[in-house]
Swiss-Prot record:
Pathway where this protein functions: Protein modification; protein ubiquitination
Membrane topology field: Multi-pass membrane protein
Transmembrane segments: 63-83, 107-127, 159-179
Name this polypeptide is given: DSC E3 ubiquitin ligase complex subunit D
Complexes and interactors: Component of the DSC E3 ubiquitin ligase complex composed of dscA, dscB, dscC and dscD.
Gene: dscD
Ranges in a coiled coil: none
Keyword terms, alphabetized: Endoplasmic reticulum, Glycoprotein, Membrane, Transmembrane, Transmembrane helix, Ubl conjugation pathway
Length: 331
């Protein structure tokens, strides 16, 4: 994660965020109604930066696993073992385009352990690479790639060590994918409340119109008047609380959104942010329970995303109907 690409992704997110240094800490009393929206905006920004770092780490680990598989193929000269794990890696772990975002519904645990245990058993009982005098004691590659230069025989301990390393990397990628799915789910949950804009008339009456809009105009007017009385009654209490907050240390106040001359992505750019607390046994247990539990009954029809709908329409001529069924577009 020390490559410039990861920090370039974070800098791009910071540029498009529109949040400058210190603008959250310098909010005045007139901007107090903007604090909840700024907090929500910063939270979404930090989640987007976390997803960007996870995607970069997944791509790096994916390349590393393919390098390990190539090294194993270089030593055991078995196309079958290389193909088994390469197919599992390509289907379940290799990052793909947005219409094919990873989900937790895939059988990650079974694919990881079955493929790796099969390769370990094959290395122990069936694979014994040997070189003849015709090749001067050196191994040649298998069916697809002809590697030359590996000295025979190959130690069984080295094969098991690389097999175990591939298994650990697969489990780390599984934990990252699960964390990415959870983070993306948090990002997609947005508030449906409609906020009304504060105007000059409401400001003169002492009424805050940033409360969610009511369905009834009569009830809304009554609530506005009530808000005005409450605001004037609690003016002294609010001033005292603001005075106490200004005198308090920023670290002692849990509601302080940010310090002066700081940015929400400073933790990511400085390398102090934790994108995942990885526990291999916890990841295996949670994913196994998630895979074995029955899926909940669908209460509403499936509505695909815009990218998925465009891909199905352009590539296969299909569309998802109101009942959730895939239908062919009749021209």
């Amino acid at each position: 994660m020390t490559t410039p690409d990861a920090f370039r992704d974070a800098e791009y997110i910071a540029d498009v965020s529109g949040i400058s240094y210190g603008n959250v800490a310098n909010l005045t009393e007139q901007d107090a109604n903007v604090v909840p929206r700024e907090n929500e905006r910063m939270r979404k920004l930090q989640l987007a930066a976390k997803v960007a770092f996870i995607d970069r780490l997944l791509r790096d680990l994916d390349i590393l696993i393919y390098c390990e598989l190539s090294a194993l193929y270089y030593m055991d000269c078995s196309v079958i073992l290389f193909a088994i794990r390469a197919i599992v890696q390509l289907i379940f772990f290799t990052p793909k385009a947005p219409p094919f975002d990873p989900t937790r519904n895939q059988p990650f645990i079974g694919a990881i352990f079955v493929s790796n245990i099969f390769c370990m058993i094959f290395h122990n009982f069936f694979t014994h690479p040997e070189a003849s005098e015709a090749t001067r004691g050196y191994l040649h590659g298998g069916l697809l790639i002809d590697f030359i230069g590996q000295k025979a025989p190959i130690s069984l301990f080295r094969l098991f060590l690389l097999d175990f390393l591939v298994l650990i990397l697969d489990l780390v990628m599984l934990g990252l994918i699960v964390e990415r799915v959870k983070t993306t789910g948090q990002t997609s949950t947005t508030s449906t409340e409609i906020l009304r804009v504060q105007d000059h008339d409401s400001e003169e009456r002492g009424v805050h119109r940033t409360r969610p809009e009511s369905r009834s105009s009569v009830v809304g007017a009554e609530l506005d008047e009530t808000d005005g009385h409450i605001t004037r009654a609690n003016a002294g209490v609010g001033e005292q609380a603001e005075h106490t907050q200004l005198l308090a240390d920023p670290s002692e106040d849990g509601h302080t959104p940010g310090a002066k001359n700081s940015h929400p992505l400073d933790a990511f750019s400085s390398g102090e942010a934790v994108i995942m607390n990885l526990g291999l046994f916890d990841v295996i247990r949670d994913q196994w329970k998630y895979s074995t539990t029955a899926p909940p009954a669908r209460t509403s029809s499936y509505i695909p995303s815009d990218q998925t709908a465009a891909f199905l329409r352009a590539r296969f001529g299909l569309q998802v109907g109101p009942d959730g069924r895939v239908q062919r577009i009749e021209s």
